[in-house]
Amino acid sequence: MELKSTALGKHLAQHPYNRVQLLNAGVNVSGDRHEYLIPFNQLLAIRCKKGLIWGELEFELPESKVVRLHGTEWQETQQFYRHLFKAWQSWSQEMSDVSSAVLQRLVDEISEQEHRDGWFSRQALMRVQQEIRAGFAALPLPLARLNEFDACRDNYQQCLCWLEQGEAKRQQANQRWTQTTLVAQRAFFDTVESSPLNPSQCQAVVNGENAVLVLAGAGSGKTSVLVARAAWLLHRGEASPQQILLLAFGRQAAEEMNSRIRERLDTDDVRAMTFHALALHIIQQCSRKVPVISRLETDGVYRREFLSRHWQQQCDEKKTQAKGWRQWLTEELEWTLPEGNFWQDSVLASRLAGRLERWLGLMRMQGGTQSEMLALADDETRPLFQQRLRLMAPLLKAWKKALKDEGAVDFSGLIHQAVNYLDKGRFVSPWHHILVDEFQDISPQRARLLEALRRQSPESSLFAVGDDWQAIYRFSGAELTLTTAFEQHFGEGAQCILDTTYRFNHRIGEIANRFIQQNPAQLKKTLNSLRDGDKKSVVLLEQEQLDALLDKMSGYVTPEARILILARYHHLRPEVLDKAQTRWPNLHLDFMTIHASKGQQADYVIVLGLHEGRDGFPAPVRESVLEAVLLPRPEPYPDAEERRLLYVALTRAKHQVWLLYSRDEPSIFVDDLHQLGVPMPRKPG
């Protein structure tokens, strides 16, 4: 069937189209020079209009496009329109049945996902939305027409809602499921650890995102959450023991976690290991030779002697090296050196050994060539950094030769080699769930190992437990932004906060939390205490009052109570402790640095050394150019890491903290704490 413009109508209209032909499932609109084929599946509306004399047909298409035919005889136009409209409506009804079936399938899939007994992850939402878009693309009807049909309207709107508001609906589904699950699985959460898990711990354990960061404040039960997470995966059948990997930063922490797993899960098949043990395992699986860890890594005294000896040797053999080292130590570190062959001074060599150890460790951790390391420095720093690299180069060469002669590897080499095996596909990761403790201490090198493992299996999940408020290891390469910008590095996921501490009272928590959050870059979180405290829970005291304080404590502290005495440096250990066993025989006193106290707790804590100066707290910035380039970029907030270090010290205590300061040169932290309401009595109360 065809409709044409009249001769006069065609002449007067001067329009590109003058005829329309009805096809099997569409129309063909054409003119002398133009032709437009419009299938019914692109047609949104057909309109028949009457002008002054002639008829007009309008075909509405997507994206507001309209094709018009002018100059047709009016009665013929009406007749053609009725026939066309009937054919179009008949086709549309048939296609609406097809569309209805597709939409019903999509809605059924959405409902199944929304109400399944499990976590609704971001990845699952992406798959649902991809299915909806694919389903829409396969529909025979234009989307804009679906609301016309009763069989399609509601399901189409539901699909559309999941495209536009999917994240909100996903969160609602997870909230419902979590509430139901915590009630249904109460017996599990009450018995999986020695004490029942609290709601925030339970919510972290059941979170099934592919990347989960659990912010675990001091004393909030992070190890319980890690153990419970592994148990939950097994309990739910989401993983076999061999598919779960737990990672800790130190051997002792890994052993403690394994002990907890054996005790609570009654299995040896789920194992915690250090990053170095993981790298060693990967290399062993890919090589016939079992790697030997060098004595340079396992024996600290031997390592420092090795570095001192080779440093002295290079200064002996090359005057230019000796001159360069003199310049470095005097100008940058402000050390006073003896005249002449300063490198032969055994005290100086011993003092420098620790620095050489750290600098070489950073170079080994970075890996790559000298030119690759140079590229890390900015234009202003590069010339001096290059000089320092040249001075360190003989030590690096001697280190590598010693490893080769020993047929051994160091820890940095282990991780570099493991990442290389993973990237080349020589090792296929069996782990679908990676659980990491103390995540705030992770370095870029270790993060690369995690990323390499996850690239092997895009569906693998990362469950990271840490606390950016306790990040105190930048000097050894830890990168805080791997925690504070977690999603940028490890993908979109979820952040959970453990909101209850079982260690310190409310007053200690209040002071510590307000003190640490004076730095706006720290992640915001609430940490509630179960016990109240009073103003005496945190006290500023002059450092001369230490003896008087211990005298006072000996009158009421029980022998079972632990008193932790903390300082920024080892050499600040007070001499009074040498006579403590006889003067205060019933006081359980332990001294350590604040860094060493991480993970410890005590009934009472005494923090020493809140004074200004070279060994002050906060410590003055004394980074060499080598550290400035190879370590993660410093934070803009003043003394950010030192502030976190004092937070760690404060939060070791259960009942009471005394902060001892210098009256003549008080630390800037003293004023900060006093303004937060910490009292400054003249004598111990």
PLM region spans:
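Anionic N-terminal interaction surfaces
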Residues: 1-19
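P-loop NTPase Walker
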Residues: 16-18, 23, 30-37, 44-52, ...
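Conserved helicase NTPase motor core
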Residues: 127, 136, 140-218, 224, ...
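A basic/glycine-biased coupling hinge at the interface between accessory DNA-binding modules
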Residues: 135, 143-176, 181-182, 234-408
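Short glycine-/polar-rich loops that comprise or flank the Walker A/P-loop
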Residues: 210, 240-243, 268, 458-460, ...
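Helicase P-loop NTPase motor core
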Residues: 213-214, 220-226, 492-494, 501-587
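Conserved helicase C-terminal RecA-like lobe
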Residues: 433, 558-560, 588, 598-663, ...
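Conserved RecA-like helicase ATPase core segment
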Residues: 447-535, 680-681
